[in-house]
Amino acid sequence: MAQIASGVNEIKSNLGDIRKLINQNAQYDQKKEYQVQVTIIEARGLIAKDADGSDPYVKIFVGKLPPQVTNTKSNASTVVFNQSFTFKDLFLNQIELENQEITLQVIDQNQFATNPLIGQQSIGLSTLYRSNNHEFFKTWLTLIHPDQGIEPQGYLLVSCYIIGTEDRPPVHDINEAKEDDDDGCSFLNIPDEELNDEQRKKKAIWKQPVVPINMPLNKREQYQLLVSIVKGEDLPILTGSTCDSFIACRVGSNVLRTMTVKNSQKPNFQTKMVFPVFFPVYNDKIVIRVWDSRTLRSDNFIAAIPEKPNENDWFNINTLHSRGGTMSFRWFHLYGVPLPERPEGMIDEVVKKLTKQVEGTMYMGRILLSLSLSPNEKAELGLQSLGGYKEPPILKYIIRCDTFELQSSFDCGQYIMIEINFGGQVIRSNLCQKRVDSHEKQKNNQQSSRTRELNQYIWKDSKSQIKDELQIDIPFDQSQQPDVIVSLYSVTPNKKTLDYDVGDMKRQAYIRIKPTSRELEHEQPKWYQLKPVKYKTIQEVHSHLLMNVELKTEMVAKQKTRHPIKRSLKQMYQFKGYLWGGYDLLPSHHSDDTCIKAQLQIGTRIIDVVTGRKGKNVIWNHSLEFLIELDEKLEFSSNILVSFYNKKSSDEEFIGQIAIKAVACEVKIDNKQINIPPPKPKYQFYHIVQEGKSNGRILAAFQLQRSEKTFNQNNDVNEPKYDKILKDQDFKYVQVKFPLIGVRNLPEGIRDPEFVFRIPQPDLKFVITLEERKQRKELTRNYYYEKIITLKNNEEEQEQAEQKKTIGGKIFTMIAEQQKVALKNINFCTILENDISECLKIPVDLQFTPILELEIRDRAAAIKTVRYHSSISLIDYIPWGDVGTKNAKIEFFEIGKLNLMLLQDEDQDAVQNQFNDDDEGDNEDEQDSRENDFDDNRDANLIFTEQFREEVDQQNQNSDDKRRLLSNKNLDKLDGDDQPQSLKNLQNLDSLSKADQKSQFDLKSESKSRATGKTKTSKKSTSSTARKLLLQQKLFESTQTFFNAEFNPSVEFTKSLIDEANFKLEREQKIQKLADLVFELKKMKKKDEGREKQLLREIEDLKNYLVKENIFLEQGDDGAQENFDYGREIVRVPLQDQLEKGLPYKKFRLYMYGNNTHDIGIPTAAVIKAHLKVLEHDIEIIKQRKTQIRETLKNKSNRSSMSLSMRSSIQSNTFKSSRKTSRSQKLGENKPLVSYECEGDDQRFPFDIFKKTFLEFFQKQFELKTRVYLLRCTNISAQASKIEAYHLLAGEAAVCSASSYPWVIVGDGENRGKNIIKNIKDDANIAVDTLNPEFFKMYELDATLPEDWNLVVKIMNKGTAIDALIGQFEIDLEDRVLGQKELRRRIAYQTYIEYFREKCEQYKYNYEIGDKKKNYEIKINELITKIEALDRNLKLPVEYLELKHPEKNTCQGTIEFFLEPFPFDVARIIPPSTIEKPQPMEFEIRLIIWETFDIPISNPIQKSTVDIFLTVSLDSTANIKGEEIVKETDVHFGSENGNGVFNYRMVFPLVIPCSFPRLRLQVSDFSTVGSNESLGETVITLRKALKKLKEGIVFQMPTTKFKFEHPNYPGQDRGCVSISMKIINKQAAESDPVGEGQNEPNKDPILEKPKEGRNVGDFLKGTALDFSAWSFFGLTALKYFAGIFVSIVTMMILFVKPGILVN
C-alpha cells in the first residue's frame, strides 16, 4: 500500500503542477479576484517638515482602487498607527498582477497649506504574491523621497498580504503576534571581549529594564543596478512625419529617462542609468518603456520591455541576481499595437500602470541594452554616459513564403493579401480573389442547413509562391531573434489594373510565429490560425491560413534550392476512425436532455459516424473505415472536422466541433515488408469546442494511410465499413457496490429527491433480465446501466400529508404541498449494487474505463431543473492493472480534462503523444524516433546558445554560496541518474523565506554534456520526463506567441506550511536547549568562559539565520522564554485534510449544470458521502446465477420456493471467488489504488461501511456534546468606512480597524427548552474597534447526528441598526467524529457490541449452538475492555479555518479555535478544557523628570537662550481606554547652556498586556507666538519592565539619563534628560496616591518646586528687554522712573475725578 500511496501522491502532485501551469500560462487575459490587506504598524525617524515636527499620516494605494489613509499623529517622528486596511474587489489578470503595486506614502498634514510628502515606498503585488505565505510580516520599509535621492526619510513597519479566491490569509499564533521593540541591539549575547567600546556601551544600556528605541537596523544589502541603453532601430512613425523617441526606466520607486532623440527611427541614446537596489527586494520589477515625444499633445506609447513580465525573465531583479547579476548586451524587440487598432484609453492605462496588457500585433523596432547588478554601498541615482559596448554576433537569414488558401467565417472583402514582417522588413503575397463555389447550390437542404458559412480564398499554383525572398541580418542567439508576424489585409485595388497602395489596405488578422518554432524549419505547407487584430480573448480565431513559411540561414538556403509547391496532385487514402465514447458532454444540459449525434467531414465527404445515444458519458465503441481522395501532400488538406449535434426530438442543435490536422493522422507503413500488423491507434481526448468553450470531450483516434486502390464512385469499397473497437473478449465482468450514506449541503433543497446511479455500457443485452427488458424497452436505446432510488422517509411524510376532500360527489386526492420540506441534507443509507446476473462490462484496457455518473434530482416533473450531478473515474477502484499503469491512465484522463488550450497549439500531436504510454507492440525504431524527436525539440526550444550557457555557468560558479537555494520542490519524482539536467534545474526553482527575498535560480548549463553526445535513457524515464517537460513547454508556447527572453517555465514561489512549522519548531528547540545550557553554566558559576561564548554565539547564529523569525523571545537575565501556552498541538494546515485519511467513506463533489471550461459543470459545496468497490467475477458464476433466475421466472409459482440454501450457495460461491480475488490482490500488484482500511482502525473490528450494520449508523440518532473553543480571529475584513473629518473633507477614503465590532453566533439550530441548546448568540460580548478580536470562550452545544451534521459559526459585525455578517465557517461533525481514530474505534466497538448482543438474544433459547453464543459473549466483554482502555484525555489540536461569506469569493479572515465533538458518555468523562484570555493587569506609572542637559539652541544667530519644556505621551495600546495620554511639564525659561530643572512628576495609568508599552519624551523650545519648535525626542520601551512587574508588585528605575535624537540632525548630540520611574499596581496606587507635578500629595519623594528659570527676568532673557544686559545704575534709574510714572498717573486720576476718594 505504500507503493500505491506514493504513486497516487505523485500523480496528484503532477496534476496540481499541470493545473497551475495552465492557469498561469494559458489564461493571461482572464481576471481573477484578489484581496489585499495592509497593516501600518509604526513609523520611526520621520523627517520633520515643520518646526514643531511632522504631523504624519499614511496614504495607501493598491492598483487602481481608491486610496485609503490612516489617522494623523501630531508632532512626532516616532509614532504608532497600528491600523489595518482592506482592499477588496481587486480584479487582475496575470500581467496586471505583475505590473501593479502597493504604494505607501507618508505625508505631513498641514491645515492651511499643501501637505508635503515625507517619503514613500512601493511593494510589487507579484513580489508579494510570490513571497512566503503571500505576505510580508512586520517588515521595515525605508522611506525615500523622489527629490532626495536614496537618503532615508524615515522607516515604516508594515505587514501586508494578498490572497486570491483559492488562498487563505496567513496565520500567526499569539506568540508570533507580539511586538518586539528589542531589535536595536543584535549583539546582546556576544561576550564583551569581542565588542568595541561603543558596542559595549550600547550593550550596557540594553541590559537595563528600560531602554530607548533606536532606528531599525538596516540589514539590507545595497547593490547598484546599471541599465545601459545603446540604441534603437526601426522605430515606427506613429503620428506626423517624425519619430522623437525616448526611453523611461522604472526600478522600484525611482524613474529615469534618456534624452529625446528627435527625427530619427534609429536613435542613438548611449546612456547608462544607475539605480540603487536593496536586498531583499520588495518590488522586483524592472520596467522599460519606449515613447514617442509629442510637443502639443500627449506622448505616444510605442512598446514596453519586457512585453509580458515574467518572474523568470531578465527584468526580474531576483532572477537577474541569481544569474550572476550580468546580462550582456542583447537586442530586445518591440511589439505594439498600431494607433488605429488601439482600444480607447490604452495610453492612460499604460501611464498609470493599469494596462490590460494587449498583445502586441505589430513589430515596432528593437532596442540594444544590457543590465548589470553588483554590490555597491555608495550607489547614487543618476544618469551617466555610456562607454564601449559589444553587439551580439549576427547571422544572415533568409525567409521564404508560399500562400495557398484562406478559410474564414468573416467576410474579408473581394481581395486579400498576406504580409510577412520579419525584423522590420516586409514581403507581400499576390492578391487573391474570393472564391464562389459552382456546386454550392447543388447541396441538399439537410447538409446545407448544417454547413456554416465559410469564405474561401485560394491562390492559383502560379500565384501561390512569393517570389521575393527576405534577407536580413539578425542575432545568432535565437532568444534575440524577432517573431515572424503574418498579417491578413483586405485590399480594395483598382478594378482594371489591380494596383493598390497603403491606403487601400485594411488589416484584419495576424499571427506571431516564434523563430524557434519547428514549423519554420521544413519546406511544407501548414495551417495557421489567425487572430483578429481587435480580439476579445487571446484564444479567439479569425481565420485559417494554409501557407509555407521557411526561415533558414543563408548558407542552408543556398544549399537547398527552392522548388515550386504544386497542390493539384491527388492520392487515395484509407481513413480509419475510432470513436470510443464521450465524457462530460454538454455541462449545461441534463443527462436526459443529452443525445449526441456526430458527423464527420473530411475533404468533400460528410458521414454520420455516431447516432444518437442518451447520456453525458456514453460509450459508442464505433470504428469506421473508407477510402477518400485527398491531396497527395496532406499538408494541403483541410482539417478533419467532427461536428456534434444534440438531438431534441426532430431538431438538432449544433454544440461544437473538433478539428484535427490531416497530416497529424498520417500513418506511414513500409509496403515492401510482408505481414506487418496494422498500426495501433493512438487515442487521445478531443474537446468539443464552441465559441472558445468546451462542451465535453471524446476519446478517439484517427488514421490516414496511403492506398493503392482507385476511387470508384459506384464501388462498394467506397462505402464506410463500421465495426466495434472492443469485442466481448476485451471486457471483464464486474459487480459494483456503492454504499450511499447521503447528500450534504445542497445549495437548493429538493422536495422529492431521487438518486440516480448510472454507468455507461457498450450494450445491454447481457445486463437486463427478460422481465426487466419487457418492462423497460427504452433502456436498449440508452446504453447504460441505471438504478434509481427514492427517499423512503419522504414518501411516508408525503403519504401522511395526503388529504381527501369531497367536492360535488367526487373524491379528489390532494397533496398538501406546503407540508413538503425542501431537503438540503438527504440520508439514503443504502447499498447500490448490481446483481451478479447483471454484471457490468468494464474494458480490460484501462484507457477505456467508463465513468460512473451520479445525479440527485427532484422526482416532480415540474421542477426537474433542480439537479446536481457528479462523475467518478473507476480507475482508482479497478482491481486489475499495476500501479504504474493506473497512475499513467489517471494522468491521461486528468490531462484530457485540461488540454483544451493544446488545441490552439501548432503541434498538439507531438505533445499528446507524450501523454500516451507506449504500447507493448511498439517496435524499438518508433520508440527511438520519439526519443530523438523529444531531444530535438528540447535542443530547439529549451536551451540558449553554447556561448551564452558557458557565460551563465561561469557567473553561477562565482556567485555567493549563501544565496543558493535551501530546498528543492520536486516537479516530478524521477530517477536521479536518468533525470535530464534541464528538469533538475527546474526542480531547483523554489522560494526562500520572506526575510531573504534574494531568490535564487540555479540555472546550470546542459550544453556541455549535450556537446559530448546524447545519453540514451530508459524508456520509462524518458517518457515520464518528456511528458512533464514537453507539457510545460507546449502549454507555454500555445498561449505565448511572443517573448523577449528565453523560455523559463513559471514556478510559484511557495513554501509548504508544514516545512515552515517544522523549521520554526526545530529552531525554537535549539535556541531553548542552548539557552538552558547557558543558564546552567551561570547558575553553577562555572568558569568555562570559552564554552559560554561558544553557546552564546550559536544562539546569535540561530537568531540571525536567513529566515527572520518574528516570534518574540524575551530574554531576561536567565535567558528564559516567555510565550503563551496553548496546552495542545497547533495545526496550521486545514485539519480536514488530515481527517479525510481516516474517514470510512469518500466524499464526491456535486456540480450544477452549467458551462465551465475545465470542469464538468459549476462546482458547489455539496458532496455525496459514499464509497465504491469494484468486484471482478468469474463467468461461470454469472452463468449459474442467470440459469437459476431463468428457472425461477419459468415457474413463477415456485419463485418463493427458491430456497435460501440455493441463494446462499450462489452467494457463498460468489464470496469465495471474491475472497480468492482479494487474496490474489494482496499477494500480487493488481489491486485498487483506493485503500479500504481506515488509518488507526482495529483490523479485527473495523468500521466497515460496506456492511449494512455500519451503514445504518448514519440513520440512527447519535447524541453529541459539541464544545467549540473560539480563541481569536485574525485579519478579518473591515466592514465600513471610518475616517477623520480632515481626510473626509479632502475626499479620501479609509476602511480601517476602527470600523469592525465582531461578535459570535454558534450553531444555527433551534433550541428546545433550556436543556437542549443548539444555538448561542453571544451579542453581549462585542470586540470593539479591531480586525483581530480575541474571544477565548467555550460554547457547548447539543447535536444529534445525522440531523445536526453541519456546525455553523458566524462572526457578525455590530451595526447601528442592522448587524452584518463578516464571515462564517462550517464544520462537518460526522467527519470530525469518524475522522478521529479514537472516536471512530469507540463507535465501531459499540456497533459490534450491539450486533453481538442481538445474536445472543437470537440464540437465547437455542441450546444447540451454545458455543457460538458463548463466543459472542467473550467478544462483548473484550470490546467493553477495549472501550475502557481508550484514551480519555483527548486533546484535539488548535486549528485555523477561513471565514467565508456566501456572497464573496475571497476569504474574509481566519479564525483560531479547537473543537471537541464528544459522544455523551465521553463528554461525561472528559471535562471541558480551560482557556483563559490574558487578563489585563492595571498599574500606575509614576515618572519624575528631574533635569535636562545640553539641549541645543534652535537658532543661535537670533537667540542666545532656549525655553525648555518636555512633552511625555503614553501609547494608546498601553491605556485601558485605548486613548493616547499626553502630558507636559512647566517651562524652564532662559537657559543659556541647555540645562533645565523641572522636578516634575507625571502619573500614567498602564494596562498589560499591551502591544506598545512605550513612553515618548519630546523636548521643545517654547514660543509665545507661533508653534513650539521640536528639539529632539526619545522613545523608551517598558517591555522588560513589564516582565519584572509579573515577578513582583513594584518596579523602580533609579535616576537615569536618556539621550535625545532628531531625524533632521542625524548623528548630532541633542542633549539628554534625567528621569526616574516607579511602576506599582493599581491597588497600591489607590491606597497611596501622589499628585501631578509638585501638587499634593507630594511624597515619595517630596519634590521641590524649582525657582531657576521661572522668574520674569528669565522669561525676558535673550530678548530686547533682557535685564541681564543692563548695569546696576541703569537698573536703579529704571526703578526711580517707574515710581515717578506711577505718581503722575495717580495725580491725573485725582484731578479728573476729585471726589473719587470721598466716594
UniProtKB/Swiss-Prot annotation:
Q: Which GO terms describe its cellular component?
A: membrane
* Membrane-protein topology: Single-pass membrane protein
Q: What top-level branch of life does the organism fall under?
A: Eukaryota
Q: Where are the transmembrane segments?
A: 1681-1701
Q: Which segments carry the region annotation Disordered?
A: 913-937, 970-1025, 1194-1228, 1628-1651
Quote the disruption phenotype from the UniProt entry: Gene knockout results in defects in mucocyst release when stimulated with the secretagogue dibucaine. No significant effects on the biogenesis of mucocyst and their docking at the plasma membrane.
Keyword Zinc listed = no
SMART domains of this UniProt entry?
C2, FerI
Q: Which segments show compositional bias classed as Acidic residues?
A: 916-928
Q: Does the keyword Transmembrane feature in the UniProt annotation?
A: yes
What SUPFAM superfamilies is this protein classified in?
Answer: C2 domain (Calcium/lipid-binding domain, CaLB)
Which PANTHER family does the record cross-reference, listed alphabetically?
Answer: FER-1-LIKE, SPERM VESICLE FUSION PROTEIN FER-1
**Belongs to which family?**
Belongs to the ferlin family.
Q: Kindly provide the name given to this protein in its UniProt entry.
A: Ferlin 2
Q: Which organism is it from?
A: Tetrahymena thermophila (strain SB210)
Species lineage: Eukaryota, Sar, Alveolata, Ciliophora, Intramacronucleata
